[in-house]
From Swiss-Prot:
Protein name: Large ribosomal subunit protein bL9
GO MF assignments: rRNA binding; structural constituent of ribosome
SUPFAM superfamilies xref list: L9 N-domain-like (SSF55658), Ribosomal protein L9 C-domain (SSF55653)
Taxonomic source organism: Anaeromyxobacter sp. (strain Fw109-5)
One GO cellular component term noted in the UniProt record for this chain: ribosome
Pfam families, per database record: Ribosomal_L9_C (PF03948), Ribosomal_L9_N (PF01281)
């Protein structure tokens, strides 16, 4: 019996997959619980249509992320902080600080997307990776300098 899964089913497949199961399993378990629908021509066409829409949407999201990554590379940010001995900062520069600086430049990036391994605690130039998409990682140049006294 051929069925199209509506949801992920353990040891069988993921939602949207076309699977072949024994008739009893399909009739008595999957269909009554709404976990699958019959794989008739109409449902198969609808599945293919949904997959095409999802593929187009994913490509659009990736292209958008690549455009943002290009803009990030062209937008260096400079942060001024109070400095103590040996160019060590009082406090640190965190992902939240980088996100706020980018927002001031017109780029709304979620702070959780900024992949700062540990807060910046010294002055200097840094390249901070930003996860924009599962396949796209942008980099923003961050310059931390001493605040004028």
């Amino acid at each position: 019996m051929k069925l199209i899964l509506r949801e992920d089913v353990e040891n069988l497949g993921k939602g949207g997959e076309l699977v072949d199961v024994k008739p009893g399993y399909g009739r008595n378990f999957l269909l009554p619980r709404g976990l699958a629908v019959l794989a008739n021509p109409k449902n198969v066409r609808e599945l293919e249509h949904q997959k095409a829409i999802a593929t187009a949407k994913a490509a659009k999201m990736k292209a958008s992320a690549q455009a943002v990554a290009k803009r990030l590379a062209e937008t260096p940010i400079t942060l001024s902080r109070k400095v103590g001995e040996q160019d060590k900062l009082y406090g640190s520069v965190t992902a939240m600080d980088v996100a706020e600086a980018l927002a001031a430049r017109g780029l709304q990036i979620d702070r959780r997307a900024i992949d700062l391994a540990e807060p910046i605690k010294t002055t200097g130039d840094f390249e901070v990776p930003v996860k924009l998409h599962s396949e796209v990682v942008g980099k923003v140049k961050v310059k931390v300098e001493a605040e004028a006294a």
